[in-house]
Amino acid sequence: ITHKGMWIEVSSLNPTDKQNYISALTCFMLGAVLLGVHLAEVGFLGDDAINSMPEPWLLILRIVMILLFFIGAFFHYKFTITQDDLFNSYQSACFVGGAFGFLTFGLSLTALSPYFNFYPTFYEYFLAFAIGTVIGGYSFYRKYIAES
């Protein structure tokens, strides 16, 4: 776990774990790109729906997106089960931090939005989750890894 809890050192992994980690990351990133296209098509990103893609292609895109996320989850599971308790605790801290960030920052945005005539979209909620993940990873790093 490097960069003050923001990343793991991939070069330190054994070849099988490295392959599983990179495969999971690749599938998740490709799935995320397709999710972005899908969200833009349906207008969930705050703008009007684009509706530029024919429905059969949009259906194929959605199926491939879901498959990529499931394949990524499979490789991530294969990677995670071989890791030690420290890494699994780190991963849990990051996800709990993300959920906390979503609840505190995301729900605060929602509660305050009518007063500022600002209506959060997917990006703002994702940013709230990402901020919480960074806080969770950094807190774990400070508590368990950093040398005083």
Tell where the protein language model's regions lie, with residue ranges.
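Alpha-helical propensity feature that highlights long, continuous alpha-helices across diverse contexts
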Residues: 1-82, 86-148
